């Protein structure tokens, strides 16, 4: 029996990791939950669903070391899917990792789950915090595993988030030339990969990369146009120099976090190697598959709207 504690288990990625762990035999899944955390109905429902499948809730707060000592007792692996600023990503994760060491945990996953953040430009707040936390955690006597997946395919192509392509109005918006390569992986595939790494019997310390696609903005636009049999109106928002100027002039780097992300995407090289085939049962969602499904869903919505 492998015991896995997940911090951030009520978020999109964390609950998907928990779900994939529950699909495996012989895994004890524990979810670190603050007693005082506000109860979002959606998250509460997801939490109760995981509990109904066999997960257990463990009270704890990354700002309370004593609670972390209790939460990490009898645990083999800790996975952090936490989001936030310095008090969470640096202070909280380091406190969680230190509690893990004190209680004999052997493997720890910091909340990386991104492009190659170690090569990201200095100043990007979301990546600077993680690099700082990772350096402190790497120094501890743990098997530390950094999962890098590129950008989340589903979020980058969702018009309600990054909004690269919007089939509602046949538009596309991008930064750069459109030919800069980057990696994309769905959040669910990233979670599945992480869940398998968590129970891998080998010492898997270090950086582990997975990628559903290496692509460009122009390739995404061209494939969308082919599938939808349409022509998108493409808006170039600016180039890398424009992004550098915007981020440099901002009084608060968090106010331009999207611009920092796109600057990183178009300037950080794609992965030179991946471990896509480490687990044969993990069939990654390709860009074509994702865009095909998205187009079919769009057609269904159009049909419903016309009926």
Residue ranges and their predicted role:
Residues 239-307:
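A hydrophobic C-terminal alpha-helical subdomain
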Residues 235-237:
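Catalytic domains of carbohydrate-active enzymes that cleave complex glycans
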Residues 2-46, 53, 63-66, 70-71, ...:
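Oxidoreductase cofactor-interface core, primarily capturing Rossmann-like NAD(P)-dependent enzymes
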Residues 60:
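Cofactor-binding loops of NAD(P)H-dependent oxidoreductases
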Residues 81:
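Catalytic cores of nucleic-acid ligases and guanylyltransferases
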Residues 75:
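An anion/phosphate-binding loop that grips the pyrophosphate of nucleotide cofactors and donors
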Residues 78:
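Receiver (REC) domain switch-region micro-motif
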């Amino acid at each position: 029996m492998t015991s896995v504690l997940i911090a951030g288990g009520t978020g999109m990625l964390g609950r998907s990791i928990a779900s994939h762990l529950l699909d495996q035999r012989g895994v004890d899944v524990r979810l670190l939950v603050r007693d005082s955390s506000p109860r979002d109905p959606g998250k509460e429902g997801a939490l109760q669903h995981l509990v109904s499948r066999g997960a257990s809730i463990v009270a704890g707060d990354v700002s309370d070391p004593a609670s972390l000592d209790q939460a990490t007792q009898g645990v083999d692996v800790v996975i952090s899917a936490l989001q936030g600023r310095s008090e969470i990503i640096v202070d909280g994760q380091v406190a969680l990792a230190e509690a893990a060491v004190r209680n004999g945990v052997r493997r720890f996953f910091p909340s990386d789950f991104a492009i190659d953040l170690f090569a990201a430009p200095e100043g990007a707040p979301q990546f600077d915090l993680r690099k700082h936390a990772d350096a402190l955690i790497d120094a501890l006597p743990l098997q530390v595993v950094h999962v890098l997946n590129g950008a989340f395919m589903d979020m980058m192509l969702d018009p309600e988030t990054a909004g690269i392509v919007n089939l509602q109005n046949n538009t596309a918006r991008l930064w750069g030339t459109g030919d800069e390569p980057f990696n994309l992986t769905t959040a669910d595939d990233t979670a599945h990969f992480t869940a398998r790494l968590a129970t891998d019997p080998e010492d898997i310390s270090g950086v582990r990369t997975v990628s559903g696609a290496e692509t460009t903005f122009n390739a995404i636009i061209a494939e969308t146009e082919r599938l939808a049999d349409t022509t998108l109106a493409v808006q170039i928002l600016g180039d890398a120099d424009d992004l550098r100027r915007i981020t440099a002039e901002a009084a608060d780097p968090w106010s331009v976090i999207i611009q920092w992300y796109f600057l990183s995407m178009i300037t950080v090289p794609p992965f030179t190697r991946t471990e896509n085939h480490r687990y044969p049962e993990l069939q990654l969602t390709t860009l074509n598959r994702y865009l095909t499904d998205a187009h079919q869903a769009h057609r269904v919505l159009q049909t419903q709207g016309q009926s």
